[in-house]
Amino acid sequence: MAQKPNFLKKLISAGLVTASTATIVASFAGSAMGAAIQQNRTTNGVATTVDGVGFDQTVALANVAVAPNAVITANANNGINLNTPAGSFNGLFLSNANNLAVTVSEDTTLGFINNAANNANRFNLTLDAGKTLTITGQGITNVQSAATHNAQNIVAKFNGGAAIANNDLSGLGTIDFGAAASTLVFDLANPTTQKAPLILADNALIVNGANGTLNVTNGFIQVSDKSFATVKAINIGDGQGFMFNTNATNANALNLQAGGTTINFNGTDGTGRLVLLSKNGAATDFNVTGSLGGNLKGIIELNTVAINGQLIANAGPANAVIGTNNGAGRAAGFVVSVDNGKAATIDGQVYAKDMVIQSANANGQVNFRHIVDVGIDGTTAFKTAASIVAITQNSNFGTTDFGNLAAQVTVPDTMTLTGNFTGDANNPGNTAGVITFAANGTLASASADANVAVTNNITAIEASGVGVVQLSGTHTAELRLGNAGSVFKLADGTVINGKVNQTVLVGGVLAAGAITLDGSATITGDIGNGGGGAALQSITLANDATKTLTLGGANIISANGGTINFQANGGTIKLTSTQNNIVVDCDLAIATDQTGVVDASSLTNAQTLTISGTIGIIGANNTTLGQFNIGSSKTTLNGGNVAINELVIGNNGSVQFAHNTYLITRTTNAAGQGKIIFNPVVNNNTTLAAGTNLGSAANPLAEINFGSKGARADTVLNVGEGVNLYATNITTTDANVGSFVFNAGGKNIVSGTVGGQQGNKFNTVALDNGTTVKFLGNATFNGNTTIAANSTLQISGNYTADFIASADGTGIVEFVNTGPINVTLNKQAVPVNALKQITVSGPGNVVVNEIGNAGNYHGAMTDTIAFENSSLGAVLFLPSGIPFNDAGNTIPLTIKSTVGNETAEGFSVPSVIVSGVDSVIADGQVIGDQNNIVGLGLGSDNGIIVNATTLYAGIGTINNNQGTVTLSGGVPNTPGTVYGLGTGIGASKFKQVTFTTDYNNLGNIIATNTTINDGVTVTTGGIAAGGIAGTDFDGKITLGSVNGNANVRFADGIFSNSTSMIVTTKANNGTVTYLGNAFVGNIGDSDTPVASVRFTGSNNGAGLKGNIYSQVIDFGTYNLGIVNSNVILGGSTTAINGKIDLLTNTLTFAGGTSTWGNNTSIETTLTLANGNIGHIVIAEGAQVNATTTGTTTINVQDNANANFSGTQTYTLIQGGARFNGTLGGPNFTVTGSNRFVNYGLIRAANQDYVITRTNNAENIVTNDITNSPFGGAPGVGQNVTTFVNATNTAAYNNLLLAKNSADSANFVGTIVTDTSAAITNAQLDVAKDIQAQLGNRLGALRYLGTPEMVGSEAGAIPAAVAAGDEAVDNVAYGIWAKPFYTDAHQSKKGGLAGYKAKTTGIVIGLDTLANNNLMIGAAIGITKTDIKHQDYKKGDKTDVNGFSFSLYGAQQFVENFFAQGSAIFSLNQVKNKSQRYFFDANGNMSKQIAAGNYDNMTFGGNLTVGYDYNAMQGVLVTPMAGLSYLKSSDENYKETGTTVANKQVNSKFSDRTDLIVGAKVAGGTMNITDFAVYPEVHAFVVHKVTGRLSKTQSVLDGQVTPCISQPDRTAKTSYNLGLSASIRSDAKMEYGIGYDAQIASKYTAHQGTLKVRVNF
């Protein structure tokens, strides 16, 4: 795998730098293995040089150079000159008690420098100008020491055979860089580390450092003398280190980079390390001129583990001491190492890419006196043990890792700490860093990525003093507040994954500080850990309605009086903990009414949410929380008054109110969800402030509950003005506990079932101060209901109480129920205080019951009942024992109404029902009024005596055949007035009604027996207050108490039941008069007829439902309807002068003489069921005189079927011999309702009069068709005859329901005509179009010519080609396509309906030359034809989809003659939709579609001969003549889609032979740009020689003789005119365009074509 380029650079650099070291190591290894002999050379001369002088000599006493890799033992007290170019020696060994000078006069590599033999002395090194000494520190093993040889190659053990360790520089003294530049390199063969560096002792000094360069290329070098700081340049390689642990330059400080010296970091990675060790009693501080590190290189460490120390910028703290303040100028790293009780102070700006703070033991202190900035992608790591870091200026720690150390960063007032801080606080038992702000300050992210947390799993962020600490981004840390004036300010989007004020500050305490928000924020942990200083003073939300504070903790605790503040624009608090109960122990302060949201929507039903503080303000100016969403939690509001604009309760959620005052403007909940609990915990009452709405009409709460009273006497709800309670159930936990107090005025609503659940009743209800309270549901109370100070209790459901009373007599009970309800009260031992009034305002009935036996006093009392608002038709049932004349008071009962009596259904009244007591209604007693009639009723078998002259009431009974009414209110000349007796036919009847005086009863009489005393006249039925109070009569009226001389008069519109009876106590006495329209029951009987029955109205009618026996019956000019099956008229004389409508019934004249006036007519009805007809019977002993009648009409309502033949007869008058007069023409005419029947009247042999009925359908239908658009259709007359003679078809029977001639003609006409001729002609036209396309193709081929045809055989054809042109159709074969569109219109001709046909199609062909004179080809055609039929077939549509196959060819003869022809075979799929009609039972006509789908086959051919004549240059005339034959055949099919008019269609073939004569004229070639254009015009005459269209036969189901289709009436001769142009660009491609017109009598067609051909 290829290495990265920077890796290669490192590899090359390391190889070059360590080449000499590798040589030494390799030589030593080789010596040890016998590959070479290592020398040990000793000095013995004055001048000692490694080239041989001054060293031990050979056997011949000759000097010999010191071999490479040899060890040098200094025995003589003489200096040594290392003058071997690129010399390399294993080491120097001092075996002389003197300091020896070593001169490096050539570049030299040296291993160890040892003074073990004379440790008081050193080698002092001097480097010549430009020379480099490389020290590798390579040691020597004991094996190697024992095997070294001298110059004589004799073993001379080095160091007595003892080893010298690697990196032993104990013999190193001064290093003198001389008067010119030279270099010292530490390139350790066995590199040291920072933990175990190569330490240069105090005797290792630098002389002339200003001329020196010190390179550390391998290993860590620690120096002990300040002189090393004087080296002009110290260069530290990647991964290597240089460490200062020295005496001081001045005082206790070491000056670095003074006088132009520099410390540099070589290499590409910048990982070289400079370590500054504060030394006790020596250099504790480091004064730096300029800055250390840079260009992202160099790691600088300040180590004060031993003693407090400082890193000081000589230019002042406002200057960089580490790196520079731009990205490229930063040091690679900065490390600060401290220990417990020790401090490191950096008095200058720090710019490093990576920073490490480490403490050997906990509580080491690091002080940054100015900016610390690790840059955009820099890092800070806390290691080893916890340390304390104090910054003084804005600082950037970058990505900071606290690990699991309890480290602390302190930030002074107004400063910003930037970074992304990570710890390991999630690891149990670990801590992970604290950031402490002294006062104001900001903690900011160092990352541009908002998803990177600012703090992650650190221990805490602390605000320890007065001031605002600004936070943004995401934090996983605890927030701690150490002063009452401490504030955390959270920017928009801040997330705190941790708690607030749970743990004391580092070195401090918790205090009730505050949190403020600039936008949305999240705090996931608890806030405050109980009372005292750990609780928060306040949380202030952002002043923005769109911002949210999300709280995930279970405890939000504030100090006493602490608040969550919603500013003017609100904001949202969202509670999200779903695992624990939640306590919010603080007030919610609202700045602006109806703003702010508390969102606990995510809470579950397993959680309890407690708000232990006030919410908003209830007062003169309410300030409500905009919305509180409790989710599904159990929420308790128990810490003070609560003002909420909208309380949102999730499914199964509940809210508990305590002893405070609550304003809930509205609740939002799903219907039947949510629960409110009143549970006062300090006293026994809860107060709902004015304007509170719990639940709503659309979405009631599931339950409102009154909690257990506990040790208290009751649980009381004080209800303010305008408070409304909506719940499915309003319950009480304890039986007989829970009282409502409504005393604030205004209106209140209580909706839902109140009490009764599990048998638990509520206690009491109290109304006062003019309050109106509406209970919309059932309510059950054990105690009393009291109403005072003009208050009103509105009841809409069942209501149970001990009693209902008004101490001051001003209380009102108002029933507003829409359905029936029961009010249940207890009987009382003493009287209760009377109500001012009972009002009925709803349409539902009210039953007031009383139970118990405590006494005989009623549970509610009043002297006034009022019907108001929507109570029309309502009924109030009073408790048993309360009469109309006495309600327990000194004055009679007043019954008032303001609701009138008009309804959409007619007259109606509100009613009061009494039972168990008789009543007397006195004259003057207020009951109803003229415009507001009321109803009085009996609920038991008691009586009512009416003494009022005018009673604005109707009277009824609840139980059938119970109750008596005596009407005695009339006075002489002034009849009494009552508004009805009974509620209508079918309702309960009174047992007895008695009229003792004259009366106008402006309503019904519904009584088993009604007696009109002798001499009394009663008029019944009529009009009251603009509406009909009732006109029904059911039961029996007895005229007279003894003598029968009473009179009854029925007002207009009386409706008598068929079982009703009017009888007289004495025969031939008593009169019955009808003043208007009437339905008449039975009057008198054959033994005791009444004196007279007269009908005195004008232009009225009477429906006779019973028999009439009267001395005189005078119908006046009434029209009579016989509405019972057999009505008998018996009496001495009967007068009729109007219409007698018999329907299907029998009218019998039983006796006496009946006279018919000149307006008399008869109507009768013929029924289909039994063939009966209404008729008249003149019994023996009776006679009818009709001698004075004028022309009288007999009309038959014919409901029988007209599907019959011949003539039917029906008896109209039986006993005709007793009919005196002429019945028949000219005095009588007979008409009937069935237009297909002729009616007549004849007299039978027995003199009875008989109606005749003759079928006339054929004539009627024929006439209907003749006068319709179908009348001119050829052959339609015969088809109509065929249709009407097929009387057994469903279509024929359906026709007989037609109401008029137009419907009849349309129904029949669409069946007996068809479109087969049009469809066949259209299909043949399409086949001819395809043949024409083939003919045009053949003509174009001959005209354009080919080389094969040029010559004598081609005749005149080439003459049409312009001079110089070549024939272009010079290929053997080609393929072509011709799309075309045809629009044809055939007008109505010869009576045959026209059509419009539009055809789109394409013909695709392939042709070739069979030989020089014969061309043949084949083609397929695809077509679609849409036919819309016209005239009397308008609305019919046909679609034809065709596919054809054709063969075509042309033969060239001699002398310019030719023949051409084609054969075609096509298959067509036809979809035909024809209109039909259908009549329902009432003769209403609807349109239906008969669909016919079938296949058609068409085939044929044509042959044409012609002659080409060259009329002139460029013009070719071709006369032509020929024949064409086509044959078409349809398959048989059955229509679908109609109810009665589907036809079976059978077809035969159609064919035609046409003679074709015409000519074509071809013009010369026209060259247009690169195209050759060949024009052509033609004209042909096509004449039909022979052929016929199929006579299609069609039958309906059940029809035997078929209908025949209309013959073809289209023109035989047509004319074709056309023109075309062929266009060629080359021999391969040909294009064309053409137009043709077809013209015939009443027919035109236009066709357009395109052409494309590809020649091969």
Curated annotation (Swiss-Prot):
Coiled coil: none annotated. Keywords: Cell outer membrane, Membrane, Periplasm, Secreted, Transmembrane, Transmembrane beta strand, Virulence. SUPFAM superfamilies: Autotransporter (SSF103515). Residues 1339-1363 form a propeptide. Residues 1368-1656 form the Autotransporter domain. Gene3D superfamilies: Autotransporter beta-domain. InterPro entries: Autotransporte_beta (IPR005546), Autotransporte_beta_dom_sf (IPR036709), OM_autotransptr_brl_dom (IPR006315), OmpB_passenger_Rickettsia (IPR022095), OmpB_ricketsia (IPR048195). PROSITE patterns: AUTOTRANSPORTER (PS51208). One of its GO terms (cellular component) is cell surface. It comes from the Bacteria. Belongs to the rickettsiae OmpA/OmpB family. The 120 kDa surface-exposed protein is a major structural protein which may play a role as a rickettsial virulence factor and/or immunogen during infection. This is Outer membrane protein B. It comes from Rickettsia japonica (strain ATCC VR-1363 / YH).
